[in-house]
């Protein structure tokens, strides 16, 4: 009897101390600093399995089986209210989120697949009336990304909106969420711009938007360059601090050496390209090129 009790207590201890899900990362707005936000984004990048590194940039895996394909991000606002966000670790796409006993998923095939593995114990599942690409989100929000503030206070507001699910502002909140997590993980410049706004908001420059819209193209050309003496097969156009279009043709460019932090696997390009808006606008910025 005593042995049984000891064994039972041991099992219970192991259960209580085990991590919830491998790869989970968390960020709390209360007491947040530029440094703590940077640690959060660094931990998010570390939670993404990669195939190998090209020019010291992790190349994300092309696929993973079942639940291994997803990781959770736990975000807590100033009011101590938490939402859990599910991402696809092969492309850092947000699939949906959970607030309390309710899960919310984008209206797309990839999110439907994710729902088989994450938030399965939620008592209620809501399918959002739009997919997760920016074009659809901007239509639902009635505004473009350039007019939606970013910064840690904006992230706090986004968490609150999603926690209580305000349908009128959910699409805008999701764009703030995506840029504050996925896009910041993809680009050091976006991480830095958001992280240094601890107590104020800012409107994203069109240069930020151009980086976001160019992730697939840059990833593809960097992979091509790895077997082409560092040269791009097709140039990628970005914008410099003088609001001028700059053509990136090789891996010596600053956006490659000191900005992009993750590479989308070429095997996943078709699905991502389908989600990039056809019309891309560009503007000024200060990232290294």
Curated annotation (Swiss-Prot):
InterPro entries: Ribosome-inact_prot_sf, Ribosome_inactivat_1/2, Ribosome_inactivat_prot, Ribosome_inactivat_prot_CS, Ribosome_inactivat_prot_sub1, Ribosome_inactivat_prot_sub2. Coiled coil: none annotated. GO terms for molecular function: rRNA N-glycosylase activity; toxin activity. Its EC number is 3.2.2.22. Gene3D superfamilies: Ricin (A subunit), domain 1, Ricin (A Subunit), domain 2. It comes from the Eukaryota. PROSITE patterns: SHIGA_RICIN. The keyword Phosphoprotein does not apply. Residues 1-21 form the signal peptide. Residues 271-289 form a propeptide. It holds the Pfam family RIP. It catalyses: Endohydrolysis of the N-glycosidic bond at one specific adenosine on the 28S rRNA. GO terms for biological process: defense response to virus; negative regulation of translation. The active site is at residue 183. Belongs to the ribosome-inactivating protein family. Type 1 RIP subfamily. Abortion-inducing protein. It inactivates eukaryotic 60S ribosomal subunits. This is Ribosome-inactivating protein karasurin-C. It comes from Trichosanthes kirilowii. The lineage of its organism: Eukaryota, Viridiplantae, Streptophyta, Embryophyta, Tracheophyta.
């Amino acid at each position: 009897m005593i042995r049984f009790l000891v064994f039972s207590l041991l099992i219970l201890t192991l259960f209580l101390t085990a991590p919830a899900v491998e790869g989970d990362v968390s960020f709390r707005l209360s007491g947040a600093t530029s440094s703590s936000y940077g640690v959060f984004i660094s931990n998010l990048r570390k939670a993404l399995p990669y195939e190998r590194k090209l020019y010291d940039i992790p190349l994300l895996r092309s696929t993973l089986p079942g639940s291994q394909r997803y990781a959770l991000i736990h975000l807590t606002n100033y009011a101590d209210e938490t939402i859990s966000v599910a991402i696809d670790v092969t492309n850092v796409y947000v699939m949906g989120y959970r607030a309390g006993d309710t899960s919310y998923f984008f209206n797309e095939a990839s999110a439907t697949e994710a729902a088989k593995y994450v938030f399965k114990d939620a008592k209620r599942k809501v399918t959002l009336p739009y997919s997760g690409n920016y074009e659809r989100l901007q239509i639902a929000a009635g505004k473009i990304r350039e007019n939606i503030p970013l910064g840690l206070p904006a992230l706090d507001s986004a968490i609150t909106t999603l926690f209580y699910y305000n349908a009128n502002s959910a699409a805008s909140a999701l764009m703030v969420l995506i840029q504050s997590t996925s896009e910041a993980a993809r680009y050091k410049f976006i991480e830095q711009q958001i992280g240094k706004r601890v107590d104020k908001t800012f409107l994203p420059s069109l240069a930020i938007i151009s980086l976001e819209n160019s992730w697939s193209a840059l990833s593809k050309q960097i992979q091509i360059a790895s077997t082409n003496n560092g040269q791009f097969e097709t140039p990628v156009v970005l914008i410099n601090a003088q609001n001028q279009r700059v053509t990136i043709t090789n891996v010596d460019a600053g956006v490659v050496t000191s900005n992009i932090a993750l590479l989308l696997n070429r095997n996943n390009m078709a699905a991502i390209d389908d989600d990039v808006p056809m019309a891309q606008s560009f503007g000024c910025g200060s990232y290294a090129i």
